[in-house]
Amino acid sequence: MGRRGAASLPRGPSPRRPLLPGVLPLLLRLLLLPSRPGAGAGADRPPHLVFVLADDLGWNDVSFHGSNIRTPHLDELAAGGVLLDNYYTQPLCTPSRSQLLTGRYQIHTGLQHQIIWPCQPSCVPLDEKLLPQLLKEAGYTTHMVGKWHLGMYRKECLPTRRGFDTYFGYLLGSEDYYSHERCALIDSLNVTRCALDFRDGEQVATGYKNMYSTNIFTERATALITSHPPEKPLFLYLALQSVHEPLQVPEEYLKPYDFIQDKNRHYYAGMVSLMDEAVGNVTAALKSHGLWNNTVFIFSTDNGGQTLAGGNNWPLRGRKWSLWEGGIRGVGFVASPLLKQKGVKNRELIHISDWLPTLVKLARGSTKGTKPLDGFDVWKTISEGSPSPRKELLHNIDPNFVDISPCPGKSLAPAKDDSSHPAYLAFNTSLHAAIRHGNWKLLTGYPGCGCWFPPPSPYNDSAIPSSDPPTKTLWPFDIDQDPEERHDLSRDYPHIVEQLLSRLQFYHKHSVPVHFPAQDPRCDPKGTGAWGPWV
């Protein structure tokens, strides 16, 4: 065919001729035809956006970080995409999820203290415009599957009222993987109530007892993918229950890890493997149904691993609930055929609050309807390797911090500042806070458990404590050179300390009051048998 076409071309210049009647309209019609699914992916329509959020996955809980827990699907995706090696989340569930969906620091939403507990009349402020709302405005179909944990005391707080077309999952922070029940103490009633926490849309879903949640969520996610028309932009937020406690997993996932003698770590490893398999099933569905070539796939944890429940962040210091690197250094990567660079490790500073402006820009939407954002559009940083627009990161300021899982022998009370150094006048260093600027990080107050936790083994299952005195309230580190936070540089760089304290004071001055209301006994699910809105 090609040769015959070439032979038919005129050998010399031919005179210009007017287009034959009807040819011009035909060309116009051809130009206006919609492109075939998969053709010119990304050039003519916004990409599909799939965000998978793991729960309590630690730095040392994936094999691409050297763990003996096998994560082949995550490894393959990270190796073929962009591994985020200087990526941060918050140290707890609600704060990370709120910053993901608002693009704003906790100090600007009132959620800077702990999490939203089952009976608290609280949720992400209703005047905040969330990521799914912005994507809907940009023409996306929006689905959420899994853990919400952003408040549910009134119906206006529910996912389906905050921008998601569909929702399937649970509203609180944790529950049984099989019964899907959550037990919680209602203080004012002096009773512990156990009730179902599972929803399909806004309706209680009762037909899933004895079904493992990760499998159910994966099935729903893949069903949404397979029924989705490729020409319509999709946003799928899959917030897995894995690998948050309780430590539960089908028996067959335990057998490959019989060599792990620590019981918590043994179960946890099986849970990670099942989660890895789930991610593989989701990406397989995207590929088999023609969506992958125009998909940006993001994987992230919500905080560091909880060493009390099998997680591990070695060699990083600390764990979930803490502002040490082990509590906030995120496991994350981006995989997509649309990336301009692939198979690279990105060392630029990126935070979970950056996803909102990044994804809205990719969606060709607008953030004009939001309150002032703390996040940055980092797509060029990820896709092309450009310098990150983020130079500074406020990890948090919590004036009411109490560590509910302190190191052995540590006090629950925050540390008291015993220093008279003039630079300390810039900020009250007894406050639980941390900030990052460039390669510098400063922690103040009591940051949470500051031990190092080696992976459990037959020879070593104990934490390595720090030698810091209990009155210490200030720690500056060069994180690029010292990611394990072992070398306090306060004596060597007092001017850096002073500058970072001034920045903390700036943020503290511009923060809103902490919103952490007392329990409301009307939350009691005794009458309905299910947790849900009560106002």
Curated annotation (Swiss-Prot):
Subcellular location: Lysosome; Cell surface
Name listed for the protein in its UniProt record: Arylsulfatase B
Residues with the 3-oxoalanine (Cys) modification: 93
Enzyme class: hydrolase
Reaction(s) this enzyme catalyzes, per UniProt: Hydrolysis of the 4-sulfate groups of the N-acetyl-D-galactosamine 4-sulfate units of chondroitin sulfate and dermatan sulfate
InterPro entries: Alkaline_phosphatase_core_sf (IPR017850), ARSB (IPR047115), Sulfatase_CS (IPR024607), Sulfatase_N (IPR000917)
Residue numbers binding substrate: 147, 244, 320
